[in-house]
């Protein structure tokens, strides 16, 4: 009988068993998603506790009981007011999660999601030009839906798109931080954030906004692991974990110091001295460079300093090279004293040169006097000829020509006189005027 009943109504028994199971789990007139946490099984309660501990932080908004249906809200951080950012702080250290970043907040808790998904963080595809983060961060935030559509669409041909901003490489060691921060600052400047980055003098053109602060904060922690940061950077972040601007300011200052060290080494290696400037000025210049290097924990020995100075000596100071060539114990003070001695000797010689030249010029203007006459005639030689004066050769030529001409005239006169006398004596002829013929 029982087997026949089971064979006749197999669905009824299976349906009653299914109904009994479902009646234990969820009431028939209740939404399955509306079950409270108290009615869930134990493994669901444990998962709920774990999720609540990981997702809920101090100062966050209340999460509804139906956590399967509603996603948790990010931490609400009030925007900073007037004043320095290190005084306000974007987040308190209590909000930092216990992870490798002891003093950094997770990027997912920042309220600027569209900056975290910047295309600059992705590897550039040569077949698809990614749009660049060009507009300033201080502008109004775009709609997430529009931004997703904008990233998904291929840019038009007529749209001018600059080259993609390459992100900085990840920091690999504490010693490379000074080099890494240069690439990071260049990355921020290429991202149109140059106005809030300190310049070489440590000055900032404009105060950064909350969104710009969040963007710098997220990019810094993304590419600089905390355990690889230098000690002085960790000390700043322990006071205020979001004070990246102070880190950048001190980094720029240290870069200027490093550049000054390089300039000092170049100046010390290219020293030149020929006596055109005073020896005291040269000594002060060299001593200042050496003292500045010493303040930066770079000691320059006297032997090295003397060798660099001797290499640049020229003129009357050049012979000091041979004098110091065989010396093993070189003293910088002794070298400066010898340079000063040579400079003083040359200075004295230069002062005596004008007086000697004056005596020589007076010797040229010689005064001639005749001892037999009472009236003294002073004749001054004039070495400058006027335009009207003629050279001696021309004068001699004129004199010779005039004397020759006078000699010819005298001979002609004498010949005429002799001939006339000869006629009158021999022939006794007298010259008479011609008579007219009739």
From Swiss-Prot:
GO terms for molecular function: RNA binding. Residues 1-86, 366-397, 419-438 are annotated as: Disordered. The keyword Cytoplasm applies. GO terms for biological process: viral translational frameshifting. Its main location: cytoplasm. InterPro entries: TYA. One of its GO terms (cellular component) is cytoplasm. Keywords: Cytoplasm, RNA-binding, Transposable element. Residues 1-11, 19-39, 49-60 have a biased composition (Polar residues). Coiled coil: none annotated. The record marks 397-398 as: Cleavage. It is found in: Cytoplasm. Residues 295-397 are annotated as: RNA-binding. Residues 369-381 have a biased composition (Low complexity). Homotrimer. Capsid protein (CA) is the structural component of the virus-like particle (VLP), forming the shell that encapsulates the retrotransposons dimeric RNA genome. The particles are assembled from trimer-clustered units and there are holes in the capsid shells that allow for the diffusion of macromolecules. CA also has nucleocapsid-like chaperone activity, promoting primer tRNA(i)-Met annealing to the multipartite primer-binding site (PBS), dimerization of Ty2 RNA and initiation of reverse transcription. The C-terminal RNA-binding region of CA is sufficient for all its nucleocapsid-like chaperone activities. Retrotransposons are mobile genetic entities that are able to replicate via an RNA intermediate and a reverse transcription step. In contrast to retroviruses, retrotransposons are non-infectious, lack an envelope and remain intracellular. Ty2 retrotransposons belong to the copia elements (pseudoviridae). This is Transposon Ty2-GR2 Gag polyprotein. It comes from Saccharomyces cerevisiae (strain ATCC 204508 / S288c) (Baker's yeast). The lineage of its organism: Eukaryota, Fungi, Dikarya, Ascomycota, Saccharomycotina.
């Amino acid at each position: 009988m029982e087997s026949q009943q089971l064979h006749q109504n197999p669905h009824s028994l299976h349906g009653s068993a299914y109904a009994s199971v479902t009646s234990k789990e969820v009431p028939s007139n209740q939404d399955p998603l509306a079950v409270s946490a108290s009615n869930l099984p134990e493994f669901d309660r444990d998962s709920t506790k774990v999720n609540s501990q990981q997702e809920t932080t101090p100062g966050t908004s209340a999460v509804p009981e139906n956590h399967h249906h509603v996603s948790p809200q990010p931490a609400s951080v009030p925007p900073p007011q007037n004043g320095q950012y290190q005084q306000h702080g974007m987040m308190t250290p209590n909000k930092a999660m216990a992870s490798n970043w002891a003093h950094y907040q997770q990027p997912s808790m920042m309220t600027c999601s569209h900056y975290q998904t910047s295309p600059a963080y992705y590897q550039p595809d040569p077949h698809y030009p990614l749009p660049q983060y060009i507009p300033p961060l201080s502008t109004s935030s775009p709609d997430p839906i529009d931004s997703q559509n904008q990233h998904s669409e291929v840019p038009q041909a007529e749209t001018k798109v600059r080259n993609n901003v390459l992100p900085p490489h990840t920091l690999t060691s504490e010693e490379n931080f000074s080099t890494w921060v240069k690439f990071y600052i260049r990355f921020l400047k290429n991202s149109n954030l140059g106005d809030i980055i300190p310049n070489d003098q440590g000055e900032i053109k404009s105060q950064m906004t909350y969104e710009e602060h969040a963007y710098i904060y997220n990019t810094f922690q993304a590419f600089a692991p905390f355990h690889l940061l230098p000690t002085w950077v960790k000390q700043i972040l322990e006071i205020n974990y979001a004070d990246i601007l102070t880190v950048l300011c001190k980094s720029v200052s240290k870069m200027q110091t490093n550049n000054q060290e390089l300039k000092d080494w170049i100046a010390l290696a290219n020293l030149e001295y020929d006596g055109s400037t005073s020896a005291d000025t040269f000594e002060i210049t060299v001593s200042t460079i050496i003292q500045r290097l010493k303040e930066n924990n770079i000691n320059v020995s006297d032997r090295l300093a003397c060798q660099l100075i001797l290499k640049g000596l020229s003129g009357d100071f050049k012979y000091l090279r041979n004098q110091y060539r065989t010396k093993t114990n070189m003293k910088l003070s002794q070298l400066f004293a010898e340079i000063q001695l040579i400079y003083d000797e040359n200075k004295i010689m230069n002062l005596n040169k004008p007086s000697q030249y004056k005596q020589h010029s007076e010797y040229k203007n010689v005064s001639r006097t005749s001892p037999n006459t009472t009236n003294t005639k002073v004749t001054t030689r004039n070495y400058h000829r006027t335009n009207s004066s003629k050279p001696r050769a021309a004068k001699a030529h004129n004199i010779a020509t005039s004397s020759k001409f006078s000699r010819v005239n005298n001979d002609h006169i004498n010949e005429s006189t002799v001939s006339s006398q000869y006629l009158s004596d021999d022939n006794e002829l007298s010259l008479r005027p011609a008579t007219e013929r009739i």
